[in-house]
From Swiss-Prot:
GO terms for biological process: aggressive behavior; axon midline choice point recognition; central nervous system development; central nervous system neuron development; copulation; dendrite morphogenesis; male courtship behavior; male courtship behavior, orientation prior to leg tapping and wing vibration. The lineage of its organism: Eukaryota, Metazoa, Ecdysozoa, Arthropoda, Hexapoda. The gene is fru. Residues 35-55 have a biased composition (Basic residues). GO terms for cellular component: nucleus. It comes from the Eukaryota. Residues 258-279, 360-379, 421-446 have a biased composition (Basic and acidic residues). Residues 233-246 have a biased composition (Polar residues). It comes from Drosophila melanogaster. This is Sex determination protein fruitless. InterPro entries: BTB/POZ_dom, Dros_DevTransReg, SKP1/BTB/POZ_sf, Znf_C2H2_sf, Znf_C2H2_type. The keyword Nucleus applies. The keyword Transcription regulation applies. Disruption phenotype: Mutant males exhibit bisexual behavior; they court females but are behaviorally sterile so fail to mate and they exhibit vigorous courtship with other fru mutant males.
Length: 955
C-alpha cells in the first residue's frame, strides 16, 4: 500500500536519518513509521496539539522504519549512515505545516492488499524461497521466514532477537510435525483446517508457542515487557525512570542507554502491531476488531511503561496497585469499588456487542477509529497513555490521581493536565477523522467483500450448517469476511443444535470465538480476570460445545434407527424400492397427508384438503352400475400408477374379461370380499339418501365407515355435503332427456367417479376433491364426450354438447369401429404446479360390445375428473411413508427411506423418485413435474402461445 503524509513530504530525508546525536527537544514529532505499512494516512492526524514536548522525551527520535535495526541496536551499534545531503532548516515544523497546507495530498489505497500479501507469503513458504529459519521437529524440517514467525509469535521474536544468526535452526521438542505445518499455515494464511481429534493438542502447541490469534498472548507478552521495564526503572539510581531522561545521560549513562534501546524496541513493536491492525482492519470481523483494539490499548500501556509512567501502565493492564508491589491481575484498580465498576462495564460492553450486529458494526468502526487515533498519539507522546480502551468500555474510575481519562475523551479531575489539554485540542479533529473513516470503511466493505459473501441467503443457509457455532456470547456478525485471525473452528456438516442466536440461522456469519471474548475481557483495563467470568474457559468451552454437537448427532442417529412407526407405515422387506414402488408409496397419500411435521419445511406447498382420495377405499353403492369388475383394478392401479405399459396390459386383460362374459358373477364375490376386508384407512362417510327409484334399483343403502383418523368431524361434514350435492345432481339429471344406458351410469354417479378408484383406462389415475365440483359441471354441460360411445355424430344431444367457459375441453370424434378415441380434458385452473390432464385411450373392439363401451364411458368421466385432480397431485404427497423425520435438527431434516439421503425439502426429493411422467408436447423431453415441463416450454418454445399449455395432451 502507498500513502503519503505532510510529515513525509515536509521532511523527505526523515526516513534516512541515523540515530540522534543531540539532545535538543523536538518541537513537533515527525512521521514515525506511518508513511508506510498501512493503506491510508490523513495529513491532519498529527498536525495539531503535539507541541507540548516534555523534556524527558528529548532524546527519543525514531525516524528509521527498519524495526530489525532498532531492535538489534541492543547488541551492536548501528553502522554509520551517510548524513543527509541538505541539513534541515531550523524552522522545520512550521515549514512542514505550510508545505502540507499548500500541497494537496492524495491517498492511494490497495484494496486487496491483505489478500495479495497472504497469497505471496504462502507461495514463498511452499516454494521455500527467501527462507531464513529452519524448524525441526520429529525428525522433519520445515523452512520459514523469521519476519512472519516474529510477527505472529512473540516467542519466536524473542528467540530471533536473542540469537542473531542469518539462518538459525530451531529444534522444537514435544511438537508434532503436522501441528507445526498447521501452525505455519495459520500464520501465513490466517486460517487452517484441523481435525477434531487433534484440535486440543494443536491449541496447546499454539499456546506454548504464543501464536497470535490462537492464544491470549498479547496481554501476556506486553505484561512481561512492562514487568521488565518496571524492574529496570526501579533499579535505576534515582528510583525514577523519567529523572534519568530529564537530567540527560548524567551519572547513569549505561542504564539510560539500555532503557532507551529497550524503549525503542518496544515502540517499534507497538508501531508494527498498530500497522498490522490497521492493515487487516478491512478484512477482519467485529470479533477481531474488539480483540485488536484491546491489544492496541495494551500496546499503549506498554509504551507508557517504557516512558516511565509505570503506574499508568500497571493500572491499564491490571498488574498492580500504585502502592502495593505484588501483582494482582484480577483487580488492577486502586479500590474494590473501581474494580467492580470495571467488571460491570466489561459485562455491559459484551451485552451491548451482542445486542445488535448492525449497530455493533457501526459502533465498532467508530470505536476502532477513535482507538487508532489515540494510539497514534500515544506512540508519539509517551506520557499520554492513561486512556482506557474504548472497545472494552471499562474505565478505571478509582482514586488514581495520576491518570483518570474517560471513554468519552473528557478527562476527569486529575493532576495530568497536559493530557486533558491535548484531548480537548484533538477532539474536533477526531470527530472529522471519524466521519472520514466511517465513509472509507463503507467504501472498503463494498470493494473488498467477496462475491461469495454477497450471494443469496439460501447459499448462506446451506453453508451455515457446516460452521460449528463456538460463540459463547449470542452475537452474530453481519459482516462476512474471508479472513478471520481468531480461530474459526470448522467441522463436518453438523446441524446446529444449541446456542441462542440473535438472528436467524440464515445469517451464517462468523461468530465471536471464545478466544476473542477472553482477549477483550482480559485486556479491558481494570477488570482483567474478573471480567473473564463471562468467558470462564474459552478453549475448553469451545471444545465442550463441539463435543456436545457430536454427542447430539450420535444420539440423533441412534434415534433414527429406533423410530417407532405404525405397522401400516412400515414397507415390507429391506426398503429397497424401485421407481414403481416409490410411485406406489407416493400415490398412497390422500388420507394421511396431514403430517404434523409438514408445516416447517413445506410452508410453500399448498395446504390442500386431506380428503384427496387417490387410493382411499371410501365408496358409494347407491347405483347398480357401480357393481362393476372395474373395482378389481383398484389394487392394480395402486401398484402401477403412472406406468403406461402396465396400464395398457391391464386394459387389455379387462376388456378380454368383459368380452368373455359373466359365466360366474364376480360382482357379489368382489363386493363381499371388499366388505369382509377392513379398509386401511376408515372415514365416516354418510351419503344423502338416494333417489327412490335408484334405491330400489341398487338394493343397498349407504355404507358407513367408522373413522379412526384425527379430523373425523370436519371430514364427515365435508363429505356429507358433497354427497348431498352429488345426489341433487343425480336427481336433476334423472329428469333429463333419456340417455343411452351407459350415459346413465356416467351421469348418475359423479360421486363414485370422484371417490372411488378410477377404471383401468385412466392412465394418470387421479382423483381429488376439487374434481367433484368440476365433474358436476362437466357432466351438466356435456363434457362426458358422448362420441366415445360409438354413436354416429347425429346421435349426440345438443343439450350436452355445449361447452362450459370454466372447464373447456376438446373432444375427439371416434371415426368408426376399430379406431382409438382420445378425450382431452383441459385443465384451466391456472395453477403453477398443475399436473397434466389425462388422456383416456381405449382399444375398441371391431364389434362394439356393451361392456367395452361401458368402461369407455366411465373412463371419460374419470378423465374429466382427472383434469382438476392433476393440479393437486404434485403438492399433495404423504411423506410419512417416504421419510423419517430426524429429531433435534434445525432446520428440520428428513431421511428418505428409499435412498437414505438426508434432505430438508421432502417434496422436491420425493419427485426425484417419481417416474418421468410429463412430456413436452413440442420436443418430447420428459419431466418429473408438470411445472418444470411448463417452464421448459415457456423458455424453449416461447413462440407457441401460452394458452396452448392449458390444453396440451398428456402423451
Amino acid at each position: 500500500m502507498m500513502a503519503t503524509s505532510q510529515d513525509y513530504f515536509g521532511n523527505p530525508y526523515a526516513l534516512f536519518r541515523g540515530p540522534p546525536t543531540t539532545l535538543r527537544p523536538r518541537e513537533s514529532p515527525l512521521g514515525v513509521g506511518h508513511p508506510h505499512g498501512h493503506g491510508h494516512l490523513h495529513s491532519h492526524a498529527h498536525a495539531h496539539g503535539h507541541g507540548h514536548a516534555h523534556s524527558h522525551y528529548a532524546a527519543l527520535d525514531l525516524q528509521t522504519p527498519h524495526k530489525r535495526n532498532i531492535e538489534t541496536d541492543v547488541r551492536a551499534p548501528p553502522p554509520p549512515l551517510p548524513p543527509p545531503p541538505l541539513p534541515l532548516p531550523p524552522a522545520s515544523p512550521r515549514y512542514n505545516t505550510d508545505q502540507g497546507a499548500m500541497d494537496q495530498q492524495f491517498c492511494l489505497r490497495w484494496n486487496n492488499h491483505p489478500t495479495n500479501l497472504t497469497g505471496v507469503l504462502t507461495s514463498l513458504l511452499q516454494r521455500e524461497a527467501l527462507c531464513d529459519v529452519t524448524l525441526a521437529c520429529e525428525g522433519e524440517t520445515v523452512k520459514a521466514h523469521q519476519t512472519i514467525l516474529s510477527a505472529c509469535s512473540p516467542y519466536f521474536e524473542t528467540i530471533f532477537l536473542q540469537n542473531q544468526h542469518p539462518h538459525p535452526i530451531i529444534y522444537l521438542k514435544d511438537v508434532r510435525y503436522s501441528e507445526m505445518r498447521s501452525l505455519l499455515d495459520f500464520m501465513y494464511k490466517g486460517e487452517v483446517n484441523v481435525g477434531q481429534s487433534s484440535l486440543p493438542m494443536f491449541l496447546k502447541t499454539a499456546e506454548s508457542l504464543q501464536v497470535r490469534g490462537l492464544t491470549d498472548n498479547n496481554n501476556l507478552n506486553y505484561r512481561s515487557d512492562c514487568d521488565k521495564l518496571r524492574d529496570s526503572a526501579a533499579s535505576s539510581p534515582t528510583g525514577r525512570g523519567p529523572s534519568n531522561y530529564t537530567g540527560g545521560l548524567g551519572g547513569a549513562g549505561g542504564v539510560a542507554d539500555a532503557m532507551r534501546e529497550s524503549r525503542d524496541s518496544l515502540r517499534s513493536r507497538c508501531e508494527r502491531d498498530l500497522r498490522d491492525e490497521l492493515t487487516q482492519r478491512s478484512s477482519s470481523s467485529m470479533s477481531e476488531r474488539s480483540s485488536a483494539a484491546a491489544a492496541a490499548a495494551a500496546a499503549a500501556a506498554a509504551v507508557a511503561a517504557a516512558g516511565g509512567n509505570v503506574n499508568a501502565a500497571a493500572v491499564a493492564l491490571g498488574l498492580t496497585t500504585p502502592t502495593g508491589g505484588e501483582r494482582s491481575p484480577s483487580v488492577g484498580s486502586a479500590s474494590a469499588a473501581a474494580a467492580a465498576a470495571a467488571v460491570a462495564a466489561a459485562v455491559a460492553a459484551a451485552a451491548n456487542r451482542s445486542a445488535s450486529a448492525d449497530g455493533c458494526s457501526d459502533r465498532g468502526s467508530e470505536r476502532g477509529t477513535l482507538e487508532r487515533t489515540d494510539s497514534r498519539d500515544d506512540l508519539l507522546q509517551l506520557d499520554y497513555s492513561n486512556k482506557d480502551n474504548n472497545n472494552s468500555n471499562s474505565s478505571s474510575t478509582g482514586g488514581n490521581n495520576n491518570n483518570n481519562n474517560n471513554n468519552n475523551n473528557n478527562s476527569s479531575s486529575n493532576n495530568n493536565n497536559s493530557s486533558s489539554n491535548r484531548e480537548r485540542n484533538n477532539s474536533g479533529e477526531r470527530e472529522r477523522e471519524r466521519e472520514r473513516e466511517r465513509e472509507r470503511d463503507r467504501d472498503r466493505e463494498l470493494s473488498t467483500t467477496p462475491v461469495e459473501q454477497l450471494s443469496s441467503s439460501k447459499r448462506r443457509r446451506k453453508n451455515s450448517s457446516s460452521n460449528c457455532d463456538n460463540s459463547l456470547s449470542s452475537s452474530h456478525q453481519d459482516r462476512h469476511y474471508p479472513q478471520d485471525s481468531q480461530a474459526n473452528f470448522k467441522s463436518s456438516p453438523v446441524p446446529k443444535t444449541g446456542g441462542s442466536t440473535s438472528e436467524s440461522e440464515d445469517a451464517g456469519g462468523r461468530h465471536d470465538s471464545p478466544l476473542s471474548m477472553t482477549t477483550s475481557v482480559h485486556l479491558g483495563g481494570g477488570g482483567g480476570n474478573v471480567g473473564a467470568a463471562s468467558a470462564l474457559s474459552g478453549l475448553s468451552q469451545s471444545l465442550s460445545i463441539k463435543q456436545e454437537l457430536m454427542d447430539a448427532q450420535q444420539q440423533q442417529q441412534h434415534r433414527e434407527h429406533h423410530v417407532a412407526l405404525p405397522p401400516d407405515y412400515l414397507p415390507s422387506a429391506a426398503l429397497k424400492l424401485h421407481a414403481e414402488d416409490m410411485s406406489t408409496l407416493l400415490t398412497q397419500h390422500a388420507l394421511q397427508a396431514a403430517d404434523a411435521r409438514d408445516e416447517h419445511n413445506d410452508a410453500k406447498q399448498l395446504q390442500l384438503d386431506q380428503t384427496d382420495n387417490i387410493d382411499g377405499r371410501v365408496k358409494c353403492f347407491n347405483i347398480k352400475h357401480d357393481r362393476h369388475p372395474d373395482r378389481e383394478l383398484d389394487r392394480n392401479h395402486r401398484e402401477h400408477d403412472d406406468d403406461p405399459g402396465v396400464i395398457e396390459e391391464v386394459v387389455v386383460d379387462h376388456v378380454r374379461e368383459m368380452e368373455a362374459g359373466n359365466e360366474h358373477d364376480p360382482e357379489e364375490m368382489k363386493e363381499a370380499a371388499y366388505h369382509a376386508t377392513p379398509p386401511k384407512y376408515r372415514r365416516a362417510v354418510v351419503y344423502a339418501p338416494p333417489h327412490p327409484d335408484e334405491e330400489a334399483a341398487s338394493g343397498s343403502g349407504s355404507d358407513i365407515y367408522v373413522d379412526g383418523g384425527y379430523n373425523c368431524e370436519y371430514k364427515c361434514k365435508e363429505l356429507n355435503m358433497r354427497a348431498i350435492r352429488c345426489s341433487r345432481q343425480q336427481h336433476m339429471m334423472s329428469h333429463y332427456s333419456p340417455h343411452h344406458p351407459h350415459h346413465r351410469s356416467l351421469i348418475d354417479c359423479p360421486a363414485e367417479a370422484a371417490y372411488s378408484p378410477p377404471v383401468a383406462n385412466n392412465q394418470a389415475y387421479l382423483a381429488s376433491n376439487g374434481a367433484v365440483q368440476q365433474l358436476d359441471l362437466s357432466t351438466y354441460h356435456g363434457h362426458a364426450n358422448h362420441q366415445l360411445h360409438q354413436h354416429p355424430p347425429s346421435a349426440t344431444h345438443p343439450s350436452h354438447s355445449q361447452s362450459s367457459p370454466h372447464y373447456p375441453s376438446a373432444s375427439g370424434a371416434g371415426a368408426g369401429a376399430g379406431s382409438v378415441s382420445v378425450s382431452i380434458a383441459g385443465s384451466a385452473s391456472g395453477s403453477a404446479t398443475s399436473a397434466p390432464a389425462s388422456v383416456a385411450t381405449s382399444a375398441v373392439s371391431p364389434q362394439p360390445s356393451s361392456s367395452s363401451t361401458g368402461s369407455t364411458s366411465s373412463a371419460a368421466a374419470v378423465a374429466a375428473a382427472a383434469a382438476a385432480a392433476a393440479n393437486r397431485r404434485d403438492h399433495n404427497i404423504d411423506y410419512s411413508t417416504l421419510f423419517v423425520q430426524l429429531s433435534g435438527t434445525l432446520p428440520t431434516l428428513y431421511r428418505c427411506v428409499s435412498c437414505n439421503k438426508i434432505v430438508s425439502n421432502r417434496w422436491h426429493h420425493a419427485n426425484i423418485h417419481r417416474p418421468q411422467s410429463h412430456e413436452c408436447p413440442v420436443c418430447g423431453q420428459k419431466f418429473t413435474r408438470r411445472d418444470n415441463m411448463k417452464a421448459h416450454c415457456k423458455i424453449k418454445h416461447a413462440d407457441i402461445k401460452d394458452r396452448f399449455f392449458s390444453h396440451y395432451v398428456h402423451m
